[in-house]
């Protein structure tokens, strides 16, 4: 087990009331969050699930150069609409290169590099994330079957390989605009994300 459950409390939001569970990752001391809505204890049902990687600029500062904030809001709304589900807030900012390096990558994108080229220029792979803590959270909460809100094929592969049964992948295509269209096209072209390519 790579993480420990630390605390939990009710979290009223503008979408509905969630149970917020905080976990601490032993390797990094980072706190990861599970937002649980409704009853997810019936192991016969597939739980509507979203792994949302931390994006301070999109989630909290309303940046439109990515689709993260739009996806966070949409995922919470879909979970409430479903009647139950879970959103794991995965504390690996900037595909796990950290906030400072993400802003460095933004500066490189401002002069013409795409999101993958910028990461490589800084010495990182296109995606540095490790989803093992998310798998631990699913296992801790005894979630074995899920309907996954994602456009990312890597998440599907990692979870399937870990024994989490994905009964359905649900696209989350929201928030495209003139400021992030190139970024989204790059994720489709170079990272294989299930996204429409638009110019």
UniProtKB/Swiss-Prot annotation:
It comes from the Bacteria. Coiled coil: none annotated. Zn(2+) binds at residues 55, 66, 68. It catalyses: GTP + 4 H2O = 2,5-diamino-6-hydroxy-4-(5-phosphoribosylamino)-pyrimidine + formate + 2 phosphate + 3 H(+). GTP binds at residues 50-54, 71, 93-95, 115, 150, 155. Belongs to the GTP cyclohydrolase II family. This is GTP cyclohydrolase-2.
